[in-house]
């Protein structure tokens, strides 16, 4: 993964936690979000968005499953899940992720197999 900046940044998927949506080797273009991001992206992203968050000293790619106001008791936190539950260390194991851990929102994906475009 890459480090964040105040412009579009790039990261490469290293694990299968988001398969089949994202595969190892896919390159992601991300908009900076969270406290380090663009002013209009500092709040919680939409449910269903794919985001990068910093957890336990590493950057993880996950999908937003719930906002703080949806079903969580923890304000200012997101419930993040991997699409591949069997290979994902996500909120099912570690609980909600603080909004200030958010680093980016997926804008575009390119892949070694020619897969490219927006991801939903």
PLM regions and their residue ranges:
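Extended hydrophobic leader/signal-anchor segments used for secretion and membrane insertion
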Residues: 1-120
């Amino acid at each position: 993964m890459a480090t964040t900046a105040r412009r579009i940044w790039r990261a490469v998927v290293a694990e299968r936690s988001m398969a089949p949506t994202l595969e190892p080797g896919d390159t992601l273009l991300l908009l900076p979000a969270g406290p380090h991001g663009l002013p209009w992206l500092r709040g919680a992203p939409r449910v269903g968005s794919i985001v990068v968050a910093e957890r336990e000293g590493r950057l993880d790619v996950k999908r937003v499953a719930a906002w703080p106001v949806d079903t969580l008791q923890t304000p200012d936190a997101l419930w993040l899940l991997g699409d591949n539950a069997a290979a994902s260390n996500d909120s099912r194991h570690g609980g909600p992720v603080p909004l200030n851990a958010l680093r980016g929102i997926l804008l575009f994906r390119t892949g070694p197999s020619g897969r490219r475009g927006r991801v939903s």
